[in-house]
Swiss-Prot record:
This is Nucleoside diphosphate kinase. Its cofactor is Mg(2+). It comes from Symbiobacterium thermophilum (strain DSM 24528 / JCM 14929 / IAM 14863 / T). HAMAP family: NDP_kinase (MF_00451). Major role in the synthesis of nucleoside triphosphates other than ATP. The ATP gamma phosphate is transferred to the NDP beta phosphate via a ping-pong mechanism, using a phosphorylated active-site intermediate.
């Protein structure tokens, strides 16, 4: 089973979209295995977005992510990363497919509601950074109908 980190950003939390994000991911068959509502320290934000440190928008990104609470989550399922990325839509909501989270709710590229890991390596790094060790997975009674191969 693949795991991915997902964060509802401060704009999504302020607008009451946590439930919408969770609902959409659950309807795609994914399983929520860890979650916490939290305020992000400057240190955590800078470490999370370290690969963007040299970008001109880095200071405003850190300011935004630390401006209010976020909902940090770990999701699990076959092809979880690609399913989550398709469900979120393009980073820039102007380019997001209709029916995706960002097309439906994001205001612009800076306030785009949600973050999701972009690959297995970043998922592992982000999950460890935000959660440390995540408990082993649990089984749902419906898993054998949703994922018949495994």
């Amino acid at each position: 089973m693949e795991r991915s980190f997902v964060m509802v950003k401060p704009d999504g939390v302020q607008r009451g979209l946590i439930g919408e994000v969770i609902s959409r991911l659950e309807r795609r068959g994914l399983k929520l295995v860890a979650a916490k509502l939290m305020r992000v320290s400057r240190e955590l934000a800078e470490e999370h977005y370290a690969q963007l440190k040299d970008k001109p928008f880095f200071p405003s990104l850190i300011e935004f992510i630390t401006s209010g609470p976020v909902m940090a989550m770990v999701w699990e399922g076959p092809n979880a990363i690609s399913i989550i990325r398709k469900t979120m839509g393009a980073t820039n909501p102007a380019n997001a497919e209709p029916g995706t989270i960002r097309a439906d709710f994001a205001c612009d590229v800076s306030y785009n509601v949600v973050h999701g890991s972009d690959g297995p390596e970043s998922a592992e790094r982000e999950i460890r950074l935000w959660f440390g060790e995540v408990e082993p997975s649990y089984s749902r009674s419906v898993d054998r109908w949703i994922f018949p191969e495994g």
